[in-house]
From Swiss-Prot:
This protein's encoding gene: uppP
Keyword Ligase (UniProt): no
Membrane topology according to the record: Multi-pass membrane protein
Species of provenance: Methanothermobacter thermautotrophicus (strain ATCC 29096 / DSM 1053 / JCM 10044 / NBRC 100330 / Delta H)
Keywords: Cell membrane, Hydrolase, Membrane, Transmembrane, Transmembrane helix
Function recorded in the entry: Catalyzes the dephosphorylation of undecaprenyl diphosphate (UPP).
Protein name listed in UniProt: Undecaprenyl-diphosphatase
């Protein structure tokens, strides 16, 4: 299901690369999409609290993987949290919070590797991919990423998503205000 969930983001990244890259230079776009992320998190938390019987992992089929994958594709836009969008999609579909989070983080692996390969291709062949600094950077990123995911899984299991929504709203408003100055 991870491969199926990766397809929408892969297609969006390839087909709309230039469009998404143009958004990164716009503070207004970043601020707006942070507000959108906040609403996704807030809305999915509200929906999730109303669903009494959560869906088990066996219900994570092709349809659900594609829907969550489309949420991941939206996160190519700056300000849309990839994990926030995919976890929210899982909660909107009725999955338990921990399952939605675990699937979100599994989906991140091919998405991040694919984005890295595209960036490496764009940077060019002159880059030394096996240099000591590249290996050290990869190792540091892998270790810190693992620790961050463990921490976030624990946090998501024990707390609600409202705090993340409030953070996105506050940051989005500050960025939009800065864009107006």
């Amino acid at each position: 299901m991870v491969i199926i969930g990766t397809v929408p983001a892969g297609l969006a990244g390839v087909l709309f690369k230039d469009f998404f890259e143009s958004l990164f230079s716009s503070l207004t776009a970043v601020g707006f999409f942070l507000l959108v992320t906040g609403f996704l998190l807030w809305g999915s938390e509200n929906i999730s609290r109303r669903v009494r019987e959560k869906l088990p992992v066996e219900k994570l089929g092709v349809r659900e993987s594609l829907i969550i994958g489309c949420a991941q594709a939206l996160a190519i836009a700056p300000g849309i949290s990839r994990s926030g969008a995919t976890i929210s999609a899982g909660l909107f579909l009725g999955f338990e919070r921990e399952l939605a989070a675990r699937y979100s983080f599994l989906l991140s692996i091919p998405a991040i590797l694919g984005a890295a390969l595209i960036q490496i291709k764009d940077i060019g062949a002159g880059m030394n991919l096996l240099g000591a600094s590249m290996v050290a950077g990869f190792a540091a990123a892998a270790v810190s990423g693992y620790i961050a995911i463990k921490f976030l899984l624990k946090l998501i299991k024990e707390r609600d998503l409202y705090i993340f929504a409030y953070y996105c709203w506050a940051l989005g408003i500050m960025i939009l205000a800065a864009a107006l100055i």
